[in-house]
Regions:
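Bacterial N-terminal signal peptides that target proteins for export
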Residues: 2-19
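Bacterial N-terminal signal peptides
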Residues: 15-29
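Histidine-rich, glycine-flanked metal-binding segment
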Residues: 42-59, 68, 72-131
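C-terminal helical cap
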Residues: 66-68, 391-392, 399, 404, ...
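Metal-associated gating/positioning segment near the N- to mid-region
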Residues: 112-120, 125-190, 215-218, 271-278, ...
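Divalent metal-dependent hydrolysis catalytic cores, especially in the metallo-beta-lactamase
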Residues: 157-178, 195-206, 228-243, 252, ...
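Active-site neighborhoods of metal-dependent hydrolases
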Residues: 223-237, 290-445, 541-542, 547-553
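C-terminal cap of metal-dependent C-N hydrolases
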Residues: 477-536
Length: 553
């Protein structure tokens, strides 16, 4: 093939065009508007007293040079939108007001016009990714005088959440009580405290040790009405009699009438996931009720099994998926039913991970700095829920490894069928950190990181009925996390204080890499890493207090 030699003038024109394109393809300078304030992280890396960091309010905030992941997708599918950028994102009055494209094609079409938006507060997000604020769908918030996390445990927890980009937390029942958390919700909504937005599910039955409250459909409706009067946003069915099928259906129906959705922890009960979905429950937690669909009869419990002995409960739970998976077609039919009914599955895989690798949980790098001492120092204790590893064997871990393999396969299958997945950690002592871990486990299950971000953001707000929290789109509430790195390439960048690079980079260098740099809640900007430094300070104070108390005995 003979190539025509271009005319000299045409060649120069082509060269000029190529030069312009190459120049525009390079990162654009963060052109700060004269008179605007460029927000920069707090200096230093040491812990700082809790209460030091405040939210930054702006009339018009511009996030410059960002790549964003919208968290949105095609309606009726689980297909998520890919990254877009570079862009300038404009936030006004707590809403996303504009997204200005700065890619070479669009900048060339601007023909030199000043297209860069201006603001009174600006963030240089060059090299960073902006995602919608994460939603923790299964928390147990601390608070009140009985909190194991200390008198300011709720403030500490709020900082762990915001420090990891979590802007909405659904509480699934707390020892702090609805009255205490209702006030925290009010203060958070008013912007008077540093906290994520709170969605409060009242746990039922309450107290948990009694079964004579709400044990008929009529009593259940009255109890739900009482929850509404107390200020609950939703209902958490945790044990019997809420597990009685007729009672569950009555509670879910009354909740729906009052604008309250129902979440349920089925445990091993009269109701399974099929019963709960057909009863109108909005959200099914954990794994209970799913593998049972594949059983021919009862699970093969030993004669001396006792469900309320937690070591028995979780030792034999580790064999449940293996038994249920003998009839995968039955479990697949169950998943089809949930998809048809629009029932959400919130699997909380992070909550059980110690069961498959106990040493992993005991050697996490942030245990000494971000975990409260009451969580780190606890030994197996039969009087404490979840503290049952006193005689945990390799055989138990191997059972749970296989359990996870099968469980994750069905989580992936549910998603592939169009099912509504969300992300919750169920680890109230270290919120935020374990939500990131939950998202890693979803990727281990085979989900694409884009899908995982959608699951943890707009899927969750769909379940919660928060239509205005609709991801990154003009008009949506500006709940955002600005990440110092690309979570699609390495989700470890979501861990705060550089812990995603533990053992790879020196301590003094880790903090410069990864982590959520800024968390934005309805337009209010928080220095995420500074909030985690406050959490570190609180852990230090609590550890010193515990040491003093031990020395006085």
């Amino acid at each position: 093939m003979r190539l025509e030699k271009p005319m000299k003038g045409a060649w120069h024109a082509a060269a000029r065009t190529a030069a312009i394109t190459i120049a525009l393809a390079a990162p654009l300078a963060a052109q700060v508007t004269p008179g605007a304030r460029l927000l920069v992280p707090a200096p230093g890396n040491d812990p700082i007293p809790m209460g030091t960091t405040r939210g930054e309010h702006a009339t018009r905030l511009v996030i410059r040079n960002a790549t964003f992941i919208s968290g949105r997708g095609t309606p009726g599918t689980n297909r998520a939108m890919p990254p877009e950028g570079p862009v300038d994102i404009v936030v006004e009055n707590g809403r996303i007001a504009d997204v200005v494209l700065l890619d070479p094609v669009n900048m060339r079409s601007a023909r030199g016009a000043d297209v860069r938006p201006k603001g009174d507060r600006e963030i240089d997000a060059t090299g960073m990714y902006v995602i919608p604020g994460l939603v923790e769908m299964h928390a147990h918030l601390p608070g009140g005088r009985r909190s194991a996390l200390g008198a300011r445990g709720h403030e500490y927890a709020f900082r762990l959440y915001l420090g990891h980009g979590v802007t909405i937390v659904r509480d699934a029942g707390s020892d702090a009580g609805i009255e205490f958390l209702r006030e925290q919700r009010r203060l958070s909504n008013a912007g008077e405290i540093v906290a994520p937005r709170l969605v409060l599910c009242q746990r039922w039955p309450l107290p948990l040790r009694t079964w004579n409250e709400g044990n008929t459909p009529e009593k259940a409706r009255l109890m739900v009405q009482k929850f509404k009067e107390l200020g609950a946003d939703c209902i958490k069915i945790s044990k019997s009699p809420g597990h009685y099928p007729d009672v569950m259906a009555a509670a879910a129906a009354e909740g729906k009438r009052l604008g309250m959705h129902t979440m349920v922890d089925l445990k091993v009960s009269e109701s399974d996931a099929r019963t709960a979905s057909n009863a109108g429950v909005r959200s099914i937690e954990h794994f209970y009720g799913f593998p049972e669909a594949g059983l021919d009869g009862s699970q093969s419990f030993p004669p001396d099994y006792n469900y309320w002995d937690e070591k028995d409960r979780f030792r034999w739970a580790g064999r449940l998926w293996q038994e249920g998976n003998r009839h995968p077609e039955r479990i697949e039919a169950l998943l089809d039913l949930l998809v048809k009914n629009g029932t959400n599955w919130d699997p909380t895989m992070a909550a059980y991970e110690d069961n498959r690798d106990l040493f992993r949980g005991r050697t996490l790098p942030f245990r000494e700095t971000l975990f409260h001492p009451s969580y780190v120092d606890v030994l197996p204790d039969s009087t404490t829920h979840g503290s049952y590893h006193s005689d945990w064997k390799l055989s138990d871990e191997l059972s749970w490894k296989e359990f996870y393999r099968i469980w994750m396969g069905y989580v992936k299958l549910f998603h592939d069928k169009g099912g509504l997945l969300t992300a919750g950690s169920d680890v109230g002592e270290a919120g935020g950190i374990f939500l990131v871990r939950e998202l890693e486990l979803m990727q281990e299950a085979g989900l694409h990181p884009l899908d995982v971000i959608k699951i943890a953001t707009t899927n969750a707000t769909e379940v919660l009925g928060m239509k205005e929290h609709c991801g990154i789109r003009v008009g949506c509430v500006a709940d955002l996390a600005i990440v110092n790195g690309n979570p699609l390439d390495n989700f470890k960048v979501m861990y705060g204080r550089g812990y995603g690079f533990y053992g790879i980079l020196p301590r003094g260098e880790r903090e410069k890499h990864g982590g959520v740099r800024w968390t934005i809640k309805e337009g209010t900007v928080y220095d995420a890493q500074a909030l985690l430094r406050e959490a570190e300070w609180y852990v230090q104070q609590e550890r010193q207090a515990a040491t003093r108390a031990a020395g006085s005995h």
